[in-house]
UniProtKB/Swiss-Prot annotation:
Protein name: ATP synthase subunit delta
Species, as recorded: Yersinia pestis
A UniProt-annotated Pfam family: OSCP
Membrane topology annotation: Peripheral membrane protein
Keywords: ATP synthesis, Cell inner membrane, Cell membrane, CF(1), Hydrogen ion transport, Ion transport, Membrane, Transport
GO CC terms, sorted: plasma membrane; proton-transporting ATP synthase complex
Gene3D superfamilies: N-terminal domain of the delta subunit of the F1F0-ATP synthase
Family to which this protein belongs: Belongs to the ATPase delta chain family.
Gene Ontology BP term (one): proton motive force-driven ATP synthesis
C-alpha cells in the first residue's frame, strides 16, 4: 500500500497543479472521486490488473466514465494507463484532497501590540501576511503593554518583531558585542 502512495504522489501533484492553474479544483476532485469509484468496481479492477494494452485500457476506462471526464481529465487517464497506474486512482484522490486542504487552510496569526489596532492597520497586516505565507490568515489580536509601541507578529514558528522593545533589545545586543 505504501508503494501506491509513492506512485500516486506525482500524479496527484500534477492533477492538482493543473486544477489550481485552471481554477477547477472542485471539478477535478469530483472527477477523481468518480474515477476512483470506477476502479473499485470488481470487473474494472480485473480489467486493469489484466494484460490489456494501455490504449485499450484507457479507451475502455474513459468509455465507462462517459461524460464525467473533460478532455484534460481524459488525457490524464491516458497517461496513467500508459504507465499502468490506473489502479492507484483512489490514492491519487486521497493525495489530491490533502493538497487541496493544505492550499485552502488558514494560518492563525497572533498580533501583539501595546494598544488596540484599527481596522485599516489590521487589514494591512492581514494582506502582508497572506502574501508572505501564501495562505489565508486569521488574525488573533492581543494587547501587550510590554511591546511599548509597534507590533509583534507570530505565525507558527515565525516571529516578526516590529516592536520598540525588540528594537531596543537588538540595539543593546549590538552595543554589547
Amino acid at each position: 500500500m505504501s508503494e501506491f502512495v509513492t506512485v500516486a504522489r506525482p500524479y496527484a501533484k500534477a492533477a492538482f497543479d493543473f486544477a489550481v492553474e485552471h481554477q477547477a479544483v472542485e471539478r477535478w476532485q469530483n472527477m477523481l472521486a468518480f474515477t476512483a469509484q470506477v476502479t473499485r468496481n470488481e470487473q474494472i479492477a480485473e480489467l486493469l490488473s489484466g494484460a490489456v494494452a494501455p490504449e485499450t485500457m484507457s479507451t475502455t476506462f474513459i468509455a465507462v466514465c462517459g461524460d464525467q471526464l473533460d478532455e484534460p481529465a481524459q488525457n490524464f487517464i491516458r497517461v496513467m494507463a500508459e504507465n499502468g497506474r490506473l489502479l492507484v486512482l483512489p490514492e491519487v484522490l486521497q493525495q489530491f484532497i490533502q493538497l487541496r486542504a493544505s492550499l485552502e487552510s488558514t494560518v492563525d496569526v497572533e498580533v501583539s501590540s501595546a494598544r488596540a489596532l484599527n481596522d485599516e492597520q489590521l487589514a494591512k497586516i492581514a494582506a502582508a501576511m497572506e502574501k508572505r505565507l501564501s495562505r489565508k490568515v486569521k488574525l488573533n489580536c492581543k494587547i501587550d503593554k510590554s511591546v511599548m509601541a509597534g507590533v509583534v507578529i507570530r505565525a507558527g514558528d515565525m516571529v516578526i518583531d516590529g516592536s520598540v522593545r525588540g528594537r531596543l533589545e537588538r540595539l543593546a545586543d549590538v552595543l554589547q558585542s
